Amino acid sequence: MPSDRRVALVTGANKGVGFAITRALCRLFSGDVLLTAQDEAQGQAAVQQLQAEGLSPRFHQLDITDLQSIRALRDFLRRAYGGLNVLVNNAVIAFKMEDTTPFHIQAEVTMKTNFDGTRDVCTELLPLMRPGGRVVNVSSMTCLRALKSCSPELQQKFRSETITEEELVGLMKKFVEDTKKGVHQTEGWPDTAYGVTKMGVTVLSRIQARHLSEHRGGDKILVNACCPGWVRTDMGGPNATKSPEEGAETPVYLALLPPDAEGPHGQFVMDKKVEQW
């Protein structure tokens, strides 16, 4: 029989902001905290580090680019808990500025993890969300810059209050195809694959929020995208202005919004404040 214990899950949780989010949830969330990572050894090492601090996370392997891996996690959650209370989608990749990998390959690889993988996790796990659940999709301030660098026509599409998930997926695919053809700039796209994937995650959050309000309005499940800020991680580099713990503050705030909270919902949140999209 599944336990009725509350459970929170963090993807990409073995280092950086994901690790800091997991540590904070272990301290503040009343229930089990699942630390997930693509690499089992790195994930177990992260769990041991938190155990040495007197915390008790559980580990489950998760590769968000592998549907079988996502479904194995989904089945585990169903069996062990029968549901999910908090989902923090943090797993991400980014190419360094100096990376010489051709841009169209960077676009394809970044999209596969940051947008497609996050979307697949949501498709499989959102149906498990319990009433009062919280979904946090970790995005980035680069998505705002990327949006402002899009053509007016693309900006209008990404800001639409009625855009569907299918339309969003179509736009993300078009970006990758346009990079392969070498026409992404003339088609109105910015020159940042990472920024475009994070635009996708932010708009996906808006769509998910709308869908949950329409179909499960009484359950008060809140979904938001957020920016942790510029954080000293492998990705952010050593000169960034925030520690991982400071970067975790907004995602954790959204993950632990009180049960009676009406919002934020379907918003892009930075430093615990809603940013205009």
Curated annotation (Swiss-Prot):
GO cellular component, one term: cytoplasm
Example GO molecular function: 15-hydroxyprostaglandin-D dehydrogenase (NADP+) activity
Entry keyword Signal: no
Keyword Lyase belongs to the record: no
Binding site for NADP(+): 10-34, 63-64, 90, 194-198, 231-233
Effect annotated for changing A80E: In clone RCBR6
EC number: 1.1.1.184, 1.1.1.196, 1.1.1.197, 1.1.1.71
Modification type Phosphoserine: residues: S30
Active-site positions on this chain: Y194
Reactions the enzyme catalyzes: a secondary alcohol + NADP(+) = a ketone + NADPH + H(+); prostaglandin F2alpha + NADP(+) = prostaglandin E2 + NADPH + H(+); prostaglandin E1 + NADP(+) = 15-oxoprostaglandin E1 + NADPH + H(+); menadione + NADPH + H(+) = menadiol + NADP(+)
Gene3D superfamilies, per the entry: NAD(P)-binding Rossmann-like Domain
Stored Pfam families: adh_short
Residues reported to bind glutathione: F95, K96, M97, Q106, A193, Y194
Family (UniProt): Belongs to the short-chain dehydrogenases/reductases (SDR) family.
Role summary: NADPH-dependent reductase with broad substrate specificity. Catalyzes the reduction of a wide variety of carbonyl compounds including quinones, prostaglandins, menadione, plus various xenobiotics. Catalyzes the reduction of the antitumor anthracyclines doxorubicin and daunorubicin to the cardiotoxic compounds doxorubicinol and daunorubicinol. Can convert prostaglandin E to prostaglandin F2-alpha. Can bind glutathione, which explains its higher affinity for glutathione-conjugated substrates. Catalyzes the reduction of S-nitrosoglutathione.
Complexes and interactors: Monomer.
Protein name: Carbonyl reductase [NADPH] 1
